[in-house]
């Protein structure tokens, strides 16, 4: 931050410095301050694509409490040039926003726009951003293409906090203990169990906490975190090798910290928490048999630890592994809508566990 302040002292209208400062502040969980400096960046340079996308990625994750941060989607859109709007990242953020708002017609059109984006623009994205865009476009596309019965939108809500998995059953109805609820998603992109287990305060905790404390007290809350931690390249498996720590120990400690964090946040909220475990992984033909087995073992270890610690704190656990597992702990492919996420077909199975 000091470096950016020095740059701004030399050149006060440095839109790039404000944008970079926004990224750093967001990473530190200082969300209000991040929005303020993104706003400054865009005041200097209204069609600055990076700052537009960075503020949008934060704003989408803070639906529907974004008004508390002085951010207005409509005002933010009026100054945009068509060049920014044609960018793949912009269309995917709008796809996620409209899907979160249950505006399926608009979501369809943003997905169509994304798929019509200039492939050159897509190839210029950082690999991480390209994967993000393609994954959300495909996943939400599958959710939109599923059958949507004309069910009444129940007044009672069960809130589903999580990373992309919180979209699996979004805007669907579910019966819990003879009462009907509508499942309402609250997303934190890329959040892992690991993020909640460590001391550091960051955007993952800040966004999740903002949602958690904004819900009416005594709400029913589904929690979906941990699947990213079980992937071969961005969680327990690579961390265990790097830290030279046994996988079991690392998973146990992380899961304990993850559940404890939500227990601590819940002291004043008194929500009914349901920890949703990780579904059986889809066998990935791109990995070796050994790596596939390691992923399956990781999922099993995480789910065991999650059961142990959620029970310790008297929370409920929803076991999606149980009905998604086929041979050797891999997915039976009956409930997955892609290689990672479950879809609405899982709901009757989940309902059975909650009745």
Tell me what each language-model feature is.
Residues 283-320, 340, 345:
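Substrate-gating cap/lid alpha-helix
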Residues 226-229, 263-297, 322:
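Active-site segments of SGNH/GDSL-like serine hydrolases
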Residues 16-27, 50-57:
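Conserved alpha-helical positions within TPR/SEL1-like repeat arrays
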Residues 209-250, 282:
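Oxyanion-hole/transition-state-stabilizing segment in secreted/luminal serine hydrolases
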């Amino acid at each position: 931050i000091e470096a950016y302040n020095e740059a701004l002292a030399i050149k006060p209208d440095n839109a790039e410095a404000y944008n970079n400062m926004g990224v750093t502040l967001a990473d530190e969980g200082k969300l209000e301050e991040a929005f303020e400096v993104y706003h400054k960046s865009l005041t200097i340079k209204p069609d600055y694509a990076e700052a537009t996308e960075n503020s949008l990625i934060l704003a989408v994750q803070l639906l529907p409490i974004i008004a508390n941060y002085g951010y207005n989607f409509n005002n933010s859109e009026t100054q945009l040039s068509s060049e920014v709007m044609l960018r793949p990242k912009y269309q995917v953020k709008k796809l996620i926003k409209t899907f979160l708002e249950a505006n399926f017609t608009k979501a369809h059109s943003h997905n169509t726009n994304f798929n019509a984006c200039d492939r050159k623009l897509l190839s210029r994205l950082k690999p991480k951003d390209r994967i993000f865009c393609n994954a959300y476009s495909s996943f939400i596309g599958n959710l939109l293409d599923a059958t949507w019965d004309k069910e009444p939108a129940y007044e009672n809500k069960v809130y589903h906090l999580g990373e992309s998995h919180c979209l699996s059953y979004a805007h669907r109805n579910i019966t819990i203990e003879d009462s009907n609820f509508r499942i309402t998603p609250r997303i934190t992109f890329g959040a892992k169990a690991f993020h909640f287990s460590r001391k550091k305060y960051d955007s993952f905790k800040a966004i999740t906490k903002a949602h958690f404390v904004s819900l009416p007290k005594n709400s029913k809350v589904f929690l979906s975190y941990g699947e990213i931690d079980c992937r071969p390249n961005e969680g327990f498996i690579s961390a265990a090798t790097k830290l030279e720590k046994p996988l079991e120990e690392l998973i146990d400690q992380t899961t304990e910290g993850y559940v404890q964090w939500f227990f601590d946040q819940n002291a004043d909220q008194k929500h009914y928490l349901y920890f949703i475990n990780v579904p059986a992984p889809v066998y990935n033909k791109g990995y070796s048999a050994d790596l596939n087995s390691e992923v399956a073992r990781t999922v099993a270890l995480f789910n065991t630890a999650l059961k142990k610690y959620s029970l310790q704190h008297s929370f409920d656990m929803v076991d999606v592994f149980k009905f998604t597992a086929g041979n050797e702990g891999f997915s039976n492919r009956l409930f997955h809508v892609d290689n990672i996420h479950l879809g609405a077909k899982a709901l009757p199975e989940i309902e059975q566990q909650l009745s």
